[in-house]
Amino acid sequence: MTSLEMALEYIKINNVKFLRFQFVDIHGEPKNIAYPVKLGTADGEEELMGVLENGLFFDGSSIEGFVEIEDSDMVLKPDLSTLSVLPWRPSEKSVARIICDVYRKNGKPFEGDPRGCLKRVLAEFKEEFKGEYFVGPEPEFFILKNENGKWVPGDDAGYFELEPLDEGNDLRRNIVFALENLGFHVEASHHEVAPGQHEVDFKYDNAVKTADSVITFKTTIKTLAKQSGVLATFMPKPFFGMNGSGMHCNQSIWLDGKPSFYDENNAHQLSDICLSYIGGILEHTKALVSVTNPTVNSYKRLVPGYEAPVNIAWANSNRTSIIRVPAARGKGTRVEFRAPDPACNPYLAFTVMLAAGLDGVRRKLIAPEPVEKNIFAMSEAEKREANIDSVPSNLYDAIEELRQDKVLKKALGDHIFNKFIEIKTKEYDAYRTAVTDWEFNKYVRI
C-alpha cells in the first residue's frame, strides 16, 4: 500500500468500518484512536482521505514518556504501507489498523516517538554507511489458564512436545493463520522448554518493519488467547524454577546493498566489520540491557541457570554466551544477541543494539576470542581469568550503566533517554519498597 488511492480501495474492498490509528508509548505498549469510516456519506470519502494524508490530532499528555499537558497537541501520521485488516474482527464490518508516526503540531517529528527514534538512527546509518539494518527476533511467551482464581501454565508439556501434552497446539495454529493473514512469513512454531511456553518464529526484515511486526505479533497473540479463554503473557519470568521468555535478536547490517558480516578468508569466516560489530555490542552490553530487558522482572530471568544469557562473551555454536553467531554463512551470516526479552520496546531495543554495534564498527574494535566452552560450568575464578563479565543483576544497576553511556544516549535522544531513566528509576523504587509475600512469610514470626 503506497498511495492514498490504493489505501482507499483496500478500505472499500474489505468493508472497513473502523480504522485504528496505532502508535506506541515509551514502553512499547500499543495505543490507538479508532476512526469511524463513513464512505456512504456525502463527505465521508473526503474526510477519510484527509486523515490518511494529514493525520489525526490527539492529546499526548496522558501517554507515558510523551509531553506535558501545556504542550500536548500532537499528530498521528499514518504509514500507508502498514494498513491491514485485523483477522479476528468480524469480516462484514471490518476493523483495520494503520501504524503511525508521531509528529508535533508544527509538523516536525516528535523526538519522543519510539518508532521515529529508530527511523532517525536508521536514516543516519544510511547516510553515513549506505547501510541497512535487518533484525530477526525470536519472542517467546506463556499461555496460562485460570485454576481456582490463579493463573498457572496452560499445560505440562516440554520442548517440541506434541498433543495431547501440548494443549496449546490449536491456539498456536490459529495464531499462525492470523499472523499470515497480517502479512507475516511464519517460519516455524513449537512448544518451548517450560510448561505452557511457546514460540512462533517469523522471517527477518528491515528494523522498522520488524519492530512493527513485534507489536502486531504480541497484540495478535494476546487477543486470540483472550478469545480462547486463556491468558498470553510476554512477562520475562512468570514462574520461579522455570525457564523465562526471551527474545533473541538475530541481526545483520548490509552496506551498499550487500551483506557485510561474511568473509570466507577471515577467522570464523566473519568479516572485520562483523567482529567490530560484536565488539561494540559486548562493550555496551551492561547499558544495553536496561533497554532490551527493561523491567524489574527481566532480571529474574537473567540469572545463572535456565539457559539464561548472562555471560558477556561471544561464541559460534555455544549458547552459554550472550552473543552467538549461528552456523549459516554467506548471505545468512548474522549475530544473535541473546539477552533481550519480549517486554522490551522493540523500536528502542533495535535502536540501541544498532548504535552499540556501529560504535564498534566506527572505532574498529577488535572482538575478543570466542568462548567455545560451557561458560555455565566455569567457576567464577575461571570466568575472571577469561575476562568474562556478567550482565547487571537488577534494573537499577542497568539504568546506572545507561546513565553513563554517551553512545546510547545520543542514539535515543535527550527526550527518550531522560524520560526512560526517570520512569524506570521510579519503577525500581516502587519495587524496592514493596513488601512481597516471600518477605512476609519469611519474617512475620520475628
UniProtKB/Swiss-Prot annotation:
<dbReference type="GO" id="GO:0006542">
    <property type="term" value="P:glutamine biosynthetic process"/>
</dbReference>
<dbReference type="InterPro" id="IPR008147">
    <property type="entry name" value="Gln_synt_N"/>
</dbReference>
<comment type="subunit">
    <text>Oligomer of 12 subunits arranged in the form of two hexagons.</text>
</comment>
<dbReference type="Pfam" id="PF03951">
    <property type="entry name" value="Gln-synt_N"/>
</dbReference>
<feature type="binding site">
    <location>
        <position position="199"/>
    </location>
    <ligand>
        <name>Mg(2+) 2</name>
    </ligand>
</feature>
<feature type="binding site">
    <location>
        <position position="338"/>
    </location>
    <ligand>
        <name>L-glutamate</name>
    </ligand>
</feature>
<feature type="binding site">
    <location>
        <position position="319"/>
    </location>
    <ligand>
        <name>ATP</name>
    </ligand>
</feature>
<dbReference type="InterPro" id="IPR004809">
    <property type="entry name" value="Gln_synth_I"/>
</dbReference>
<dbReference type="GO" id="GO:0005524">
    <property type="term" value="F:ATP binding"/>
</dbReference>
<keyword id="KW-0547">Nucleotide-binding</keyword>
<comment type="similarity">
    <text>Belongs to the glutamine synthetase family.</text>
</comment>
<feature type="binding site">
    <location>
        <position position="301"/>
    </location>
    <ligand>
        <name>L-glutamate</name>
    </ligand>
</feature>
<dbReference type="InterPro" id="IPR014746">
    <property type="entry name" value="Gln_synth/guanido_kin_cat_dom"/>
</dbReference>
<dbReference type="InterPro" id="IPR036651">
    <property type="entry name" value="Gln_synt_N_sf"/>
</dbReference>
<feature type="binding site">
    <location>
        <position position="187"/>
    </location>
    <ligand>
        <name>ATP</name>
    </ligand>
</feature>
<keyword id="KW-0479">Metal-binding</keyword>
<feature type="binding site">
    <location>
        <position position="248"/>
    </location>
    <ligand>
        <name>Mg(2+) 1</name>
    </ligand>
</feature>
<protein>
    <recommendedName>
        <fullName>Glutamine synthetase</fullName>
        <ecNumber>6.3.1.2</ecNumber>
    </recommendedName>
</protein>
<dbReference type="GO" id="GO:0046872">
    <property type="term" value="F:metal ion binding"/>
</dbReference>
<keyword id="KW-0067">ATP-binding</keyword>
<feature type="domain" description="GS catalytic">
    <location>
        <begin position="114"/>
        <end position="446"/>
    </location>
</feature>
<feature type="binding site">
    <location>
        <position position="331"/>
    </location>
    <ligand>
        <name>ATP</name>
    </ligand>
</feature>
<feature type="binding site">
    <location>
        <position position="244"/>
    </location>
    <ligand>
        <name>L-glutamate</name>
    </ligand>
</feature>
<dbReference type="GO" id="GO:0004356">
    <property type="term" value="F:glutamine synthetase activity"/>
</dbReference>
<keyword id="KW-0963">Cytoplasm</keyword>
<comment type="function">
    <text>Probably involved in nitrogen metabolism via ammonium assimilation. Catalyzes the ATP-dependent biosynthesis of glutamine from glutamate and ammonia.</text>
</comment>
<dbReference type="Pfam" id="PF00120">
    <property type="entry name" value="Gln-synt_C"/>
</dbReference>
<feature type="binding site">
    <location>
        <position position="252"/>
    </location>
    <ligand>
        <name>ATP</name>
    </ligand>
</feature>
<feature type="binding site">
    <location>
        <position position="319"/>
    </location>
    <ligand>
        <name>L-glutamate</name>
    </ligand>
</feature>
<feature type="binding site">
    <location>
        <position position="138"/>
    </location>
    <ligand>
        <name>Mg(2+) 1</name>
    </ligand>
</feature>
<dbReference type="InterPro" id="IPR027303">
    <property type="entry name" value="Gln_synth_gly_rich_site"/>
</dbReference>
<feature type="binding site">
    <location>
        <position position="192"/>
    </location>
    <ligand>
        <name>Mg(2+) 2</name>
    </ligand>
</feature>
<feature type="binding site">
    <location>
        <position position="336"/>
    </location>
    <ligand>
        <name>Mg(2+) 1</name>
    </ligand>
</feature>
<keyword id="KW-0460">Magnesium</keyword>
<dbReference type="GO" id="GO:0016020">
    <property type="term" value="C:membrane"/>
</dbReference>
<feature type="binding site">
    <location>
        <position position="140"/>
    </location>
    <ligand>
        <name>Mg(2+) 2</name>
    </ligand>
</feature>
<feature type="binding site">
    <location>
        <begin position="243"/>
        <end position="244"/>
    </location>
    <ligand>
        <name>L-glutamate</name>
    </ligand>
</feature>
<feature type="domain" description="GS beta-grasp">
    <location>
        <begin position="14"/>
        <end position="107"/>
    </location>
</feature>
<feature type="binding site">
    <location>
        <position position="324"/>
    </location>
    <ligand>
        <name>ATP</name>
    </ligand>
</feature>
<dbReference type="GO" id="GO:0005737">
    <property type="term" value="C:cytoplasm"/>
</dbReference>
<dbReference type="InterPro" id="IPR027302">
    <property type="entry name" value="Gln_synth_N_conserv_site"/>
</dbReference>
<dbReference type="InterPro" id="IPR008146">
    <property type="entry name" value="Gln_synth_cat_dom"/>
</dbReference>
